[in-house]
Amino acid sequence: MTNDFKPAKAGGNQPRLSKEEYAEKKRAEKEKVYQMIDDAAREIVSDPEKFKNFLDTQSRMDRYSAANALLIYSQYPQATQLKDFDDWGKDNVKITKGAKSISILEPVEYTRADGSPGISYNVKKVFDVTQTNGRKAPAVSANRDPKALITSMLDVSPVEVAATDELPYPNMAAFYNNEKQTLYVKRNVGDSVAVAQCVAQELGHAQLSINSESYSRRDMGFQAVCIGYMICKKYGVDTQNFAINRIPEGLASKEPKEIRAELSKTRNAMAEIHSHISDEMFRKKQERSKDYER
């Protein structure tokens, strides 16, 4: 048995690392990744266009944490499907020669000295499908089906849904009332894209209220806009009307750790809404298939 550790990609002529040297190498690697997260957090809140680009990345990579989305945005923002070298190999997919790996954080469970469970994070090297000879999924069509999205969003709403002729803001097609725990949708709005945008944003308010100990529509307004933007982006609905052209001073002035916490709340609410919508759309698709078979 040896106490020597060899780097994953060590060449035949490279010296082995001692246990201490290997640990130091991994510590430095992790430190570099955390610095990359902090730098990306500062960068996106300094420029609305960069913030929007980050939201585009997070909307595609909805299963990844905000911290990992920041890492992906910083290294390979156009990513759509990530796997490590071994997992691509299991699918008989080869990495393109010269492709640069993307560093993300992978949670690892461990047992503390007192016997309680804990979670630490290791740096994991992954590659996007575009860095391989694998097939890339087709891009989402613009305005794919806003009416279907509206129906699914209302069907899976975590709060009551009610139709109304008037809303507090005339230019809105939907409004979440936290006191009544109800999502109101305006009748006879002909523009299905506008309705989809409003419903997605107001669902963001509803989900943020559910996920938070306290709720303020004013304080959470920008987060709800971001959620609506990401949901519409994910389902191919136009996003130009979402007001992400100005970063709130309260967010821009925060420290990187605080920015990441806000992004995490936004990402978690978006991912929860998307999960319910996706499940509902799949269920309806299955029903249509059964009807067709009959």
Regions picked out by a protein language model, each given a short descriptive name:
Residues 1-294:
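N-terminal accessory/interface modules of nucleic-acid-binding and processing proteins
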